[in-house]
Amino acid sequence: MMRYKCVVSYVGRNYSGWQSQRKGDSIQEILEAVIERITQEKVNVIGSGRTDAGVNASAQVFMFDTKRKMPARKWMGAINAFLPDDIHIMAVEEEDDCFHARYNVRFKQYNYRINHGPYNVFTKDTVFQCPMHLDVEKMREGIPYLVGTHDFTSLNSSSLEEYPDQVRTVRSITLTEEDGVITLAFVGKGFLRYMVRMMASVFIEIGKHKYEPSHIQEILDAKRKSFPHKNSPAEGLTLEYVDYFKTLALDETGMVREFLMGDDTSCTNQELSVLEQAVKENASHQFYAMTTRHSQELLGYYEINQGEASLHILEEERGIPLANILLPQLEKRLQKQVIFKQIQIYNKSGKIVSNSVEETK
């Protein structure tokens, strides 16, 4: 089977959102129908995440597996030939089994655009047309309240039954203005349903002088779904960009993936400092984080130094079983080198608890 990574742009006005609704009018359903027409086989399109009805995308990422092998350029042309003119494939790449469009996401950027100048008929589907002028400087004052890790229960519509933990990390929010259009850029690994649109609505209300920027703290502290808030119109929101980890091994329960200093928004437990210290002490080595697949909890790290590789377990109960599951994939990558030594697994005390194949030349 071949795996292809695709980047798609779309204007969401005419569609029920990304996820299949069994009505045939979602972006996912349309893409699946087109690709199945080309491959003559059942295809499952998996996106980086959902966008709601009316929401746009400049660079939504999705993947699909197929027996049909074609050059990326031909795939792009073939799919676009059958798509409506408000959905367009921007890029296609062949990927290996370690790539996953949803689980390998490092962060996403959503932009919310507000026109607070004269009504613009040409941008009505991609920019919210605000009927009054907004105080941009007041809006900027609200940004620090939402950046960082907070409980966003009051600022999303995801049910507590489905998502009991509604703590999320917003990496950054920036506000720019050009020609009467305000752009709010939100960056984070993941957002709850309507979370970005509700945050945008808060900024709009501040811009209208409905309340002071400090009111955001009251909203966050309330931690309840019944707290009064609005959801800003869908057309102003665009999924702008999706960034991915380089991944060396992937399983249903975990992965070994790229690690960069400052990557604390994805590693959710206290063992992060151990990995960061190892990186500082061995700057010439390559380091990868071994994490759970969904929550990105750090269970250990993978270190490579000139053909020698080792897995260091930071949380033994789950880390050692996961390391042994991922070991064959890591071995396969090392075997592509002319010389490599066995991969050893160390526990927190520095004791070898397992190792891979015998030294090979």
Question: Where do the protein language model's features map onto the residues?
Answer:
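N-terminal basic, amphipathic alpha-helical segments
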Residues: D52, D263-S266
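Short N-terminal amphipathic alpha-helix/helix-capping patch enriched in small hydrophobics
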Residues: K23, I27, L31, E252-V256, ...
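Acyl-donor (CoA/ACP) binding surface of acyl/acetyltransferases
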Residues: T247-L260, F287-K361
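Hydrophobic alpha-helical core bundles mediating ligand binding, dimerization, or RNAP-core interactions
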Residues: V256-D263, E271, L275
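Short, surface-exposed beta-strand-loop junctions and turns on beta-sheet-rich folds
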Residues: G190-L192, D263, E316
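Structured-RNA-binding interfaces characteristic of tRNA pseudouridine synthases
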Residues: M1-K246
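Short amphipathic alpha-helical segments
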Residues: D52, L275-E276, L327, E331
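Active-site rim helix/loop that mediates acceptor-substrate recognition in acyltransferases
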Residues: C267-F287, T291-H294
